[in-house]
């Protein structure tokens, strides 16, 4: 509710008050003239009158004004008696606002709130869920020990409420009750255990928060709910996600073994490069013993939290980042760096927390943030706290490669008007000089130049840093010490003056003429110096007395006498100590003999370390990490267990709603090819296949025209796995759409009777398909050229499998023992047929887009784990090529690449890329191969075999496989010849990271329903109506992305589906035509980044004419 509406309500409320006669006069009284400076005893009197009115409209306006006052921060506690009377109002709007008020003031007005406790208890049974929840909130806000039993009973009832909103408030009330009476812990744990089993995303975050507050050590409550929480995480509210992620981070550190063992082993191998054979053998044995396999539940948590790195909530991104930092393998933690850098565009408070965490991470793993070095450059608008943190990160990321760039950047910072920032920059330069020995002299010379700066603070800080640097190489910088001695007359900052005196004292033997003169000047100004400087004057006098007593003996005695009567007791104490140590007398002991060794002992150079070095002991993103001190309520991360606890504790019993899918699960277990055709199965098949053949004959007699449709649908089942129920269901669904309802019912009964029976129906469908394919070939000769080409492609796809069904048909009737061989041959041929696009690439785009071919291609699918979503052949293969290496840069060698949209023969997770190499020079090019690979983390590449030679004007095409990890990152590698190596980059279009799938409209809608919220992106398209024809939409979509067409029962909705090549995540694209010349483009996918990129590419293509 905005402030404007509140103002309006106040005006309207005043108007109603005038109608009710509460305004005595319109004139301003003398006391009212001073209302700003004195409290009026009739304050809010009009609101009280309105609340006691008989009109609901007056009460409602009064409550709106009161809630408005609360929102503005005004005190409305004196209205509590008038408001609480309306808690039993029959008007639902008034009742809601009353509860909002009571939640705010129930704790302050406990006695009055207790008078209405019976009303609150009745409200817990109210049919409106908001009232039930509000009543529970008010009860838990009273905070009186006497009503603890009432609250406990209310929480138990609310935890079983049908409304998830009420159950959410029950979880909130648990924390309040626990803080009021910790003795209720055991009973509250029972409620928490019950709510943890809740499937609602609305409840998950709140109950985990209650768990963290009440019983964070009861990890056993999380075991059975672990996987559910991981899967619900994406759909939970943002602040609930933060709580759940932090809890699961602690859980993972107690239940899984460390994933860093493997990384540590690799680092050891890198350190010990030259080793003996015995050491290598020992390491091989130890590596076998320490082989690490990540727990599937551990991987589930890491995988399900990764999409949340794209969250708009900075706290969620930070929570995921700390989870990856603390529990993921080191090789995978790099994915968080980009998301954290993105948060630096937020407000300064968010920047401060994020930069603190990056500073801690950059100490251990510099490589994570080196690519984003420029993101940490200081801006003029940054506050000082942000500037110093960015300096800290830049210092941590400094190395030999980038130090020259950073020093130029620091040189600019030193001139800043912000003196605190300039001083911090000088400290940073000193740290870089100590950590990188190659630039120590350069930094020292630069700091010496700063000694002539006009700003005294800059000079003083430079002196302090130079003092620390000179401790590292004291014998080489006598000139610098002399120069600093001259600055004593101009520098007034105590720390700088003390540092110069300390340096001269340490190096008094190297500057024998300057040191006594400096002591003489300091003796003159001793009484006016700062205490810190006085202490260093005493030290300088003692060191000169021990090394050059002839010149400085009287000066030293004079200074010691001044120190003896100084006002500061530390200086008086130091004076007495030094006098007894350096001036021998009768009472002085043997210690004075070693005075020179004591004062002039070599001091170790100071270590300039990062202030964030020790913060890694705290969990990232916590208050303790920010303050660098253990805060109240902080829960420490436990160490990784040596042996993982039993993972079976996370197993959950099968829920009843999943029982109908049990047969599918059983058939999937029988899928392996080795035990596909056993003798026992053949015997069972003989009995049931006879029944199946009779049913098929009856269907043919009733519907003789169905054979053609059966053959078409059967083509889809041929490309699937014939030993599973999945493919049989696909084929039967294609037949049932053509036959009558009787045939459909009969087929479903047969399917339920035994999944093996359906295998036989598949073979019969294949037999019918072979007979009809001949008819389709003869009819295709008489059709147009477009239909001719499409029918040829159909006949080619079916011709490979023709011999197998011909051998199967007689085997069914008389020779069951021979069934073993033809089906296995059929499956093997189908497996080979999966790669048809390799040998027969589509050259003409127009016939490839014909509707008849698309309808046939919908049935073709590869055998996958899903029974309804299978990979299909591409609808269209673009012929566009991209330049990889220009002939001028390649010294005559030119390279172009394209994406053939075919399965990669090297790996299922790789994208196939065809590279055409051409020799445009007049000489032979020898030994063409792929050299070094600069691939991002996780990306893999399978190179082509080296080409011995390429004749002039010759050309050759090779295939490589690249696993892009479902990202559009460029793959950088070297294309080498015998004499040269050329750096090339290959960036895939997002549409080529997909493989098309075939699925029904029902399955499409089902999967789309699960991919909503953050997994859905949409855009509105505007174009001429002629651009929204089905053929145009199909052509444009498949030209941009490798998507499969999904049949649609609606003319104005076009659907396309694919899977990402690497992870197999579904990519669902919907183009819904609206009225006029607009359309809605919707993309549903777990890969939100790829989905948004694909949306940006499809939108202009579909919008243009």
From Swiss-Prot:
<dbReference type="GO" id="GO:0060155">
    <property type="term" value="P:platelet dense granule organization"/>
</dbReference>
<dbReference type="GO" id="GO:0030131">
    <property type="term" value="C:clathrin adaptor complex"/>
</dbReference>
<dbReference type="GO" id="GO:0003016">
    <property type="term" value="P:respiratory system process"/>
</dbReference>
<protein>
    <recommendedName>
        <fullName>AP-3 complex subunit beta-1</fullName>
    </recommendedName>
</protein>
<feature type="compositionally biased region" description="Basic and acidic residues">
    <location>
        <begin position="811"/>
        <end position="824"/>
    </location>
</feature>
<dbReference type="GO" id="GO:0007596">
    <property type="term" value="P:blood coagulation"/>
</dbReference>
<dbReference type="GO" id="GO:0006605">
    <property type="term" value="P:protein targeting"/>
</dbReference>
<feature type="region of interest" description="Disordered">
    <location>
        <begin position="668"/>
        <end position="824"/>
    </location>
</feature>
<dbReference type="GO" id="GO:0030851">
    <property type="term" value="P:granulocyte differentiation"/>
</dbReference>
<keyword id="KW-0333">Golgi apparatus</keyword>
<dbReference type="InterPro" id="IPR015151">
    <property type="entry name" value="B-adaptin_app_sub_C"/>
</dbReference>
<dbReference type="GO" id="GO:0030324">
    <property type="term" value="P:lung development"/>
</dbReference>
<dbReference type="InterPro" id="IPR016024">
    <property type="entry name" value="ARM-type_fold"/>
</dbReference>
<dbReference type="InterPro" id="IPR029390">
    <property type="entry name" value="AP3B_C"/>
</dbReference>
<dbReference type="GO" id="GO:0007040">
    <property type="term" value="P:lysosome organization"/>
</dbReference>
<dbReference type="GO" id="GO:0035654">
    <property type="term" value="P:clathrin-coated vesicle cargo loading, AP-3-mediated"/>
</dbReference>
<keyword id="KW-0968">Cytoplasmic vesicle</keyword>
<dbReference type="Pfam" id="PF24080">
    <property type="entry name" value="AP3B1_C_2"/>
</dbReference>
<dbReference type="InterPro" id="IPR026740">
    <property type="entry name" value="AP3_beta"/>
</dbReference>
<dbReference type="GO" id="GO:0016192">
    <property type="term" value="P:vesicle-mediated transport"/>
</dbReference>
<dbReference type="GO" id="GO:0046907">
    <property type="term" value="P:intracellular transport"/>
</dbReference>
<dbReference type="GO" id="GO:0005739">
    <property type="term" value="C:mitochondrion"/>
</dbReference>
<dbReference type="GO" id="GO:0005769">
    <property type="term" value="C:early endosome"/>
</dbReference>
<dbReference type="GO" id="GO:0019882">
    <property type="term" value="P:antigen processing and presentation"/>
</dbReference>
<dbReference type="GO" id="GO:1904115">
    <property type="term" value="C:axon cytoplasm"/>
</dbReference>
<feature type="modified residue" description="Phosphoserine">
    <location>
        <position position="276"/>
    </location>
</feature>
<keyword id="KW-0653">Protein transport</keyword>
<dbReference type="GO" id="GO:0007338">
    <property type="term" value="P:single fertilization"/>
</dbReference>
<feature type="compositionally biased region" description="Low complexity">
    <location>
        <begin position="730"/>
        <end position="741"/>
    </location>
</feature>
<comment type="function">
    <text>Subunit of non-clathrin- and clathrin-associated adaptor protein complex 3 (AP-3) that plays a role in protein sorting in the late-Golgi/trans-Golgi network (TGN) and/or endosomes. The AP complexes mediate both the recruitment of clathrin to membranes and the recognition of sorting signals within the cytosolic tails of transmembrane cargo molecules. AP-3 appears to be involved in the sorting of a subset of transmembrane proteins targeted to lysosomes and lysosome-related organelles.</text>
</comment>
<keyword id="KW-0813">Transport</keyword>
<dbReference type="Pfam" id="PF01602">
    <property type="entry name" value="Adaptin_N"/>
</dbReference>
<dbReference type="GO" id="GO:0042789">
    <property type="term" value="P:mRNA transcription by RNA polymerase II"/>
</dbReference>
<dbReference type="GO" id="GO:0090152">
    <property type="term" value="P:establishment of protein localization to mitochondrial membrane involved in mitochondrial fission"/>
</dbReference>
<dbReference type="GO" id="GO:0045944">
    <property type="term" value="P:positive regulation of transcription by RNA polymerase II"/>
</dbReference>
<dbReference type="GO" id="GO:0043473">
    <property type="term" value="P:pigmentation"/>
</dbReference>
<dbReference type="GO" id="GO:0002244">
    <property type="term" value="P:hematopoietic progenitor cell differentiation"/>
</dbReference>
<dbReference type="InterPro" id="IPR056314">
    <property type="entry name" value="AP3B1/2_C"/>
</dbReference>
<dbReference type="InterPro" id="IPR002553">
    <property type="entry name" value="Clathrin/coatomer_adapt-like_N"/>
</dbReference>
<comment type="similarity">
    <text>Belongs to the adaptor complexes large subunit family.</text>
</comment>
<feature type="modified residue" description="Phosphoserine">
    <location>
        <position position="610"/>
    </location>
</feature>
<dbReference type="GO" id="GO:0030742">
    <property type="term" value="F:GTP-dependent protein binding"/>
</dbReference>
């Amino acid at each position: 509710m905005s402030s404007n509406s509140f103002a309006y309500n106040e005006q309207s409320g005043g108007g109603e008050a005038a109608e009710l006669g509460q305004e005595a006069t319109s004139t301003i009284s003398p006391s009212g003239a001073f209302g700003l400076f004195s409290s009026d005893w009739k304050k809010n009197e009009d609101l009280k009158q309105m609340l006691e009115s008989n009109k609901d409209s007056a009460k409602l306006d009064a409550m709106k004004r009161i809630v408005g006052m609360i929102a503005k921060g005004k005190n409305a506690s004196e209205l509590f008696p008038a408001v609480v009377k309306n808690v039993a109002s029959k008007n639902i709007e008034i009742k809601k606002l009353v509860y909002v008020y009571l939640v705010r003031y129930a704790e302050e007005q406990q006695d009055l709130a207790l008078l209405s406790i019976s009303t609150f208890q009745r409200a817990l049974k109210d049919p409106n869920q908001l009232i039930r929840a509000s009543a529970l909130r008010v009860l838990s806000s009273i905070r009186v020990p006497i009503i603890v039993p009432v609250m406990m009973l209310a929480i138990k009832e609310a935890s079983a409420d049908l409304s998830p909103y009420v159950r959410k408030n029950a979880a909130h009330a648990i924390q309040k009750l626990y803080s009021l009476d910790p003795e209720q812990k055991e009973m509250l744990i029972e409620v928490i255990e019950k709510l943890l089993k809740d499937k609602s995303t609305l409840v998950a975050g709140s109950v985990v928060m209650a768990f963290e507050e009440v019983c964070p050590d009861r990890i056993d409550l999380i075991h059975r709910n672990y996987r559910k929480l991981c899967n619900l995480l994406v759909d939970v509210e943002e602040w609930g996600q933060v709580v759940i992620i932090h809890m699961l981070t602690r859980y993972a550190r107690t239940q899984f073994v460390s994933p860093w063992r493997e990384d540590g082993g690799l680092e050891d191998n890198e350190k010990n490069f030259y080793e003996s054979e015995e050491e290598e053998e020992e390491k091989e044995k130890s590596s076998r013993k320490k082989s690490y396999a990540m727990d599937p539940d551990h991987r589930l948590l890491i995988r399900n939290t990764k999409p949340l790195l794209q969250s708009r909530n900075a706290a969620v991104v930070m929570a995921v980042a700390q989870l990856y930092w603390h529990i993921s393998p080191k090789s995978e933690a790099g994915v968080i760096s980009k998301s954290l850098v993105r948060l630096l565009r937020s407000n300064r408070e968010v920047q401060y927390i994020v930069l603190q965490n990056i500073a801690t991470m950059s100490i251990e793993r510099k490589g994570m943030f080196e690519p984003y070095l420029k993101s940490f450059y200081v801006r003029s608008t940054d506050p000082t706290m942000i500037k110093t943190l960015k300096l800290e990160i830049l210092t941590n990321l400094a190395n030999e490669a980038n130090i020259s760039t950073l020093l130029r950047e620091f040189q600019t910072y030193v001139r800043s008007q912000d003196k605190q920032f300039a001083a911090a920059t000088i400290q940073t330069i000193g740290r870089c000089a100590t950590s990188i020995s190659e630039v120590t002299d350069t930094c020292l010379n630069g700091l010496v130049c700063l000694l002539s700066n006009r700003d005294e603070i800059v000079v003083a800080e430079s002196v302090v840093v130079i003092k620390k640097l000179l401790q590292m190489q004291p014998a080489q910088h006598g000139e610098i010490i002399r120069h600093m001695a001259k600055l004593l007359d101009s520098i007034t900052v105590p720390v700088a003056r003390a540092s110069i005196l300390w340096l001269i004292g340490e190096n008094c033997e190297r500057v024998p003429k300057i040191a006594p003169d400096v002591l003489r000047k300091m003796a003159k100004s001793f009484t006016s110096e700062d205490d810190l400087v006085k202490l260093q004057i005493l030290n300088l006098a003692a060191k000169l007395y021990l090394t050059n007593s002839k010149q400085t003996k009287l000066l030293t005695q004079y200074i010691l006498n001044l120190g003896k009567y100084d006002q500061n007791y530390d200086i008086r104490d130091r004076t007495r100590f030094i006098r007894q140590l350096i001036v021998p007398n009768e009472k002085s002991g043997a210690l004075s003999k070693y005075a020179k060794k004591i004062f002039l002992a070599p001091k170790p150079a100071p270590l300039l370390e990062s202030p964030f070095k020790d913060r890694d002991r705290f969990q990232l993103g916590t208050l303790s990490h920010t303050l660098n001190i253990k805060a109240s309520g902080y829960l420490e991360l436990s160490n990784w267990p040596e042996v993982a606890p039993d993972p079976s504790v996370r197993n959950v019993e099968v829920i009843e709603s999943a029982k109908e899918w049990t047969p599918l699960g059983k058939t999937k277990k029988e899928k392996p090819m080795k035990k596909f055709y056993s003798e026992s199965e053949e015997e069972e098949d003989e009995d049931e296949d006879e029944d199946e053949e009779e049913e098929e004959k009856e269907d043919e007699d009733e519907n003789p025209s169905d054979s053609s449709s059966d053959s078409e649908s059967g083509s889809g089942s041929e490309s699937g796995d014939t030993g599973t129920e999945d493919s049989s269901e696909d084929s039967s669904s294609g037949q049932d759409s053509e036959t009558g309802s009787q045939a459909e019912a009969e087929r479903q009964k047969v399917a339920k009777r035994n999944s093996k029976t359906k295998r036989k129906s598949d073979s019969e469908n294949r037999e019918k398909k072979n007979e009809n394919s001949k008819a389709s070939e003869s009819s295709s000769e008489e059709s147009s050229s477009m239909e001719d080409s499409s029918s040829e492609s159909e006949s080619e796809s079916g011709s490979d499998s023709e011999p197998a069904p011909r051998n199967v048909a007689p085997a069914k009737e008389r020779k069951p023992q021979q069934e073993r061989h033809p089906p296995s041959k059929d499956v093997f041929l189908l497996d080979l047929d999966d790669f048809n696009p390799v040998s027969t690439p589509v050259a003409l785009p127009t016939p490839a887009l014909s509707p008849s071919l698309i309808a046939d291609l919908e049935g073709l699918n590869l055998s996958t784990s899903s029974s309804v979503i299978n990979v299909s052949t591409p609808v269209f293969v673009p012929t566009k090529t991209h330049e990889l290496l220009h002939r001028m840069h390649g010294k005559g060698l030119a390279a172009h690449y394209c994406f053939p949209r075919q399965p990669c023969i090297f790996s299922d997770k790789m994208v196939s890329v065809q590279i055409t190499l051409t020799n445009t020079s007049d000489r032979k090019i020898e030994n063409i191969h792929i050299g070094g690979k600069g691939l991002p983390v996780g990306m893999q590449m399978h190179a082509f075999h080296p080409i011995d030679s390429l004749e002039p004007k010759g050309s050759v095409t090779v295939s490589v496989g690249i696993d892009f990890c479902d990202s559009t990152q460029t793959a950088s590698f070297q294309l080498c010849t015998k004499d040269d190596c050329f750096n090339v980059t290959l960036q895939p279009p997002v549409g080529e990271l997909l493989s098309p799938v075939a699925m029904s409209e029902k399955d499409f809608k089902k999967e789309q329903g699960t991919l909503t919220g953050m997994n859905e992106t949409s855009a509105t398209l505007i174009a001429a109506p002629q651009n929204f024809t089905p053929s145009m939409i199909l052509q444009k979509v498949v030209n941009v992305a490798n998507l499969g067409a999904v049949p649609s029962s609606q003319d104005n909705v076009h659907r396309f589906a694919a899977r990402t090549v690497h992870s197999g995540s579904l990519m669902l694209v919907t183009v819904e035509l609206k009225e006029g010349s607009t359309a809605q483009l919707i993309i549903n996918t777990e890969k939100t980044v790829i989905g948004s990129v694909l949306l940006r590419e499809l939108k202009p293509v579909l919008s243009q004419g």
